[in-house]
A protein has these predicted regions:
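Mid-chain, well-packed structural core segment of small domains
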Residues: 71-101
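N-terminal beta-strand motif that seeds the catalytic metal site of vicinal oxygen chelate
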Residues: 1-20, 77-86
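Conserved secondary-structure micro-motifs at functional edges
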Residues: 58-66, 76
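Residue-level signal for pocket-adjacent positions within structured domains
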Residues: 66-67, 105
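A short, polar/proline- and glycine-enriched secondary-structure boundary/capping micro-motif
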Residues: 28, 67-71
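Core segments of cupin and vicinal oxygen chelate
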Residues: 3, 13-55, 62, 91-94, ...
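Short, conserved acidic/polar surface loops in the N-terminal third of protein domains
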Residues: 69, 115-116
Length: 116
């Protein structure tokens, strides 16, 4: 294997209403967010909650045809993805492709929080 998984980077949670979800995570669970960000390319607005070496990411679609809106229509609100941190993203993508893993992106794509 040409790469190493080093940790869980974040868990992405699809929500219909970011403000309502933020209230739960902030007021009920007592977490502090690290700000809000819009990623126009992905048609999504996000908030991250740092938790130790990982984060929770809340994602709300900014467009009815965005990937998060489609996910919620199909599966409802909840965990949409788990992002793993690797030591070499390019090597990881090439290795996974070679092993027949279906990839959403074959090259790193930068998202919220500078994630690729």
């Amino acid at each position: 294997m040409s790469f190493k998984v080093t940790r869980i980077d974040h868990v992405g949670i699809a929500v219909k209403d970011l403000e309502a979800a933020k209230k739960f995570y902030t007021e009920i669970l007592g977490l502090k967010d690290s700000g809000e960000e819009t990623v126009d390319e992905q048609k999504v607005k996000v908030t991250f909650y740092p938790l130790g070496d990982s984060e929770l990411e809340l994602l709300e679609s900014t467009h009815p045809e965005g990937p998060i809106a489609k996910y919620i229509d199909r599966s409802g609100e909840g965990i949409q993805h788990i992002a793993l941190r690797v030591d070499n993203i390019e090597a990881a993508l090439a290795d996974l492709k070679e092993k027949g893993v279906r990839l959403i992106d074959e090259k790193p794509r930068y998202g919220a929080g500078g994630a690729s």
